[in-house]
Amino acid sequence: MRVTMSLEALTTEALAAIAAAQDLAALDQVRVLFTGKKSQLAEQSKALGKMDPEQRKVQGAAIHAVREAINAALTERQTALQQAALQQKLASETIDITLPGRGQHMGSIHPVTQVQERICQFFTKAGFSVATGPEVEDDYHNFEALNIPGHHPARAMHDTFYFDVNHLLRTHTSGVQIRTMETTQPPIRIVCPGRVYRCDSDQTHSPMFHQIEGLYVAENTSFAELKGLLINLLNEFFEKDLKVRFRPSYFPFTEPSAEVDIMDERGRWLEVLGCGMVHPNVLRAAGIDPEKYKGFAFGLGVERFAMLRYGINDLRMFYQNDVRFLRQFA
């Protein structure tokens, strides 16, 4: 009877210690004290072997009941302490949801690239292929093959970036047309977008700018076909029916040649591109018989089209990396 009473006292003492534990570390110490290998409960379990069977049965059941009560109290207290610790952590790491979020600014395609892709898409729908070539060009493909004589002003040092007497930064993408004609049999229908370089820098000119040139060579081409193609380009690009005029002009690589103007909202004529029928000397230089084939060509400045489309009066704004400006075209 004395042992049974000590179990009751042990239970009372253990439950009080469990309730008094303020954190998980203290609770673990209580667990070891009352249910560990050296605890009073373990000592009493060892004493069962010295009892007669009937007493062992009764006392064993009592010890088991005490152990279950202590373990249940330990589990309940552990859950409570873990929940309290979690609440304390949440309170210390709370997020002020009234603060504005730090949204990420999405990038976008540069307006010049947008315009270039828009123009190329028009021509690919019309059956043209996109062709590219080297930006460091030789004198032959940049000038001589295009019927540009040695005394032409474009060959001057103040207009062209030369590496040496035979190599330069291309001043137009026309060299791509020559290279294509040298390796491809007509019919040829290509557009050639890319960077070009000239010694010029002001409000409407840049040492580096983008150009798109086009070439169509076949047995039956005409200036009327060229005219219709370019008028359709201008109307689709600017999304309106424009007044367009073709002015007689001169380019060494086309004959006849013309410059194309559109009328703005103020009734002023604005030059937008140049064009013409490919000069027989250019066809001959590329190995194409000018008696059998004819062709037309055209060229335009991408930045020029972008400035007209978006109402920008200074080309240099495209290359100042001002995100406030560029974000308008996202």
From Swiss-Prot:
Q: What is this protein called?
A: Phenylalanine--tRNA ligase alpha subunit
The answer on whether this UniProt entry bears the keyword Isomerase reads: no
- Could you list the residue ranges forming a coiled coil in this record? none
Q: What class of enzyme is it?
A: ligase
Q: Which GO terms describe its biological process?
A: phenylalanyl-tRNA aminoacylation
Which catalysed reactions does the entry list for this protein? tRNA(Phe) + L-phenylalanine + ATP = L-phenylalanyl-tRNA(Phe) + AMP + diphosphate + H(+)
The entry's cellular-component GO terms read: cytoplasm
- Organism per entry: Acinetobacter baylyi (strain ATCC 33305 / BD413 / ADP1)
Give the classification, highest ranks: Bacteria, Pseudomonadati, Pseudomonadota, Gammaproteobacteria, Moraxellales
UniProt-listed InterPro entries: aa-tRNA-synth_II, aa-tRNA-synth_II/BPL/LPL, Phe-tRNA-synth_IIc_asu, Phe-tRNA_ligase_II_N, Phe_tRNA_ligase_alpha1_bac, Phenylalanyl-tRNA_Synthase, tRNA-bd_arm
